[in-house]
Amino acid sequence: MLLYYILVALWATVTYAKSFSEDISEMPELSEMSSYLNQTPEAKDVLDQQKNVTLLALENSAFRDFVGQGEGNDNQSSSNSSLLRGIFSYQLVKGLHNSEQITTTPQFSPTELNDAGFTNVSSGQIVQLVEKDGKDYAISGLNDNSTIIKPGVDVENGVIHVIDRPLTLPQSVTATLQAANLTSFQGALQRGNAVSNANDPKDITLFAPRNLGFQRIGTAFENISAEDLGQIANYHIVKGKVLYSPDLTDADHPTYADKDLHISTVDGRSYVNSARVESTNLLVNNGVIHVISDVLNPNNDTAKPVPNADPPPPAFENANPVSTDPLTDGIPSPTSVIPLPGITSGGEGGGGGGGESTAPPSPTATVTETQSGGGGGGGGGAGGGPGPTATNTPQPGAAATERAKAGLAAVVGLGVVLINA
């Protein structure tokens, strides 16, 4: 008889282990999501199969807004259901990340997003989990900050955090450079025929100089050949390694210019050769971008940091400054610029947006492409119109996407994903 009761108790334990959907149904902040799951058995089944994951779930108003937007774009949503499923996968973080584990030291956590159409990172696309000013955030593509508005709830199959806005899928290198107004380097990649080395390979780290860094040596690009410019651009791309801010320690790394660059730390600040690291951890779909003060020179690969110099000494001798952004002829200028993240590896100060904006990190701004306001060509070139500025207008999930229209990219909530499940 005792054995019978033991078996019954074990059976009950297995039978009544809660699923994700059951846990969600008990959270008032997720009642909209719960209601929709009950109406969408296929989506509910997919979610309930997840184990040992951390779910970043949209709170009610955000969920409701995105469901409404999705229903208003049925034809477009249907044709891009794979994109929406990709966003859903991106909001499922591998492993257990409760509130106590999210600290001021950033975590670069792999997610369930492994679809080769959207990511080319071996571990699965990364989301950054970090505490800032007493609040916890999930930081995604284009430096989009989603606030965790309810501390993580430990449930049977993982952890549930409630967030106030959906994550943004990391974009390609070139789309991200444009959104951040790092357009001189974007121009260097294009004119140097190095775009494929930036956008296509798996697991890269790219050090993008600010536009002001190009201006400081603008005459170096007058009449430069495509081959020489490509060598310079390729020297900024580390092969086969995704180096997040904690990895920016003393070491040499191979680049697509077939020369090593050297990372060093001085007084808690990171340098690449002699260039100062000014912004870190801008996620892209095949790795990460860090912003540096100046252009690296593959023919001066022994350049060393000069910590007391501000600005750092340029790596190009005999080059003179120009007053406009070099290499930006034909590069569309965004009408607004995403604010860049600050330095999270220690050091002093933080990054500004694209070298021109001083706006602090905030919800992703809308990124609109336009042909006006471009900078000059080969050297300083002709001046453009007024430069883009940062805006803090909240546009959850907005992104300058290539695989899907920006309008659809803004309709990126878990709710929309579930519509197409």
UniProtKB/Swiss-Prot annotation:
- Which positions are cleaved off as the propeptide during maturation? 398-421
- GO BP terms: macroautophagy
An example Gene Ontology cellular component term from the record?
fungal-type vacuole membrane
Q: What are the alphabetically sorted keywords of the record?
A: Cell membrane, Glycoprotein, GPI-anchor, Lipoprotein, Membrane, Repeat, Signal
Q: Where is the lipid attached (GPI-anchor amidated glycine)?
A: 397
**Composition skew (Gly residues), residue ranges:** 344-356, 372-387
Q: How does it sit in the membrane?
A: Lipid-anchor; GPI-anchor
Q: What residue spans carry the Low complexity bias annotation?
A: 388-401
Per UniProt, residues of the FAS1 domain are 18-167, 169-296
Q: Show the segment(s) annotated as Disordered.
A: 300-401
**Glycosylation site list:** 52, 75, 80, 120, 145, 181, 223, 300
Pfam families recorded: Fasciclin (PF02469)
Q: Which SMART domains is this protein grouped with?
A: FAS1
Q: Where in the cell is it found?
A: Cell membrane
Task: Specify the signal sequence span.
Answer: 1-17
What's the superkingdom here?
A: Eukaryota
Q: Which cysteines are joined by disulfide bonds?
A: none
Q: Which InterPro entries match?
A: Adhesion/Biosynth-related, FAS1_dom_sf, FAS1_domain
Has keyword Repeat? yes
Q: Which family does it belong to?
A: Belongs to the fasciclin-like AGP family.
Q: What is this protein called?
A: Fasciclin-like arabinogalactan protein ARB_02922
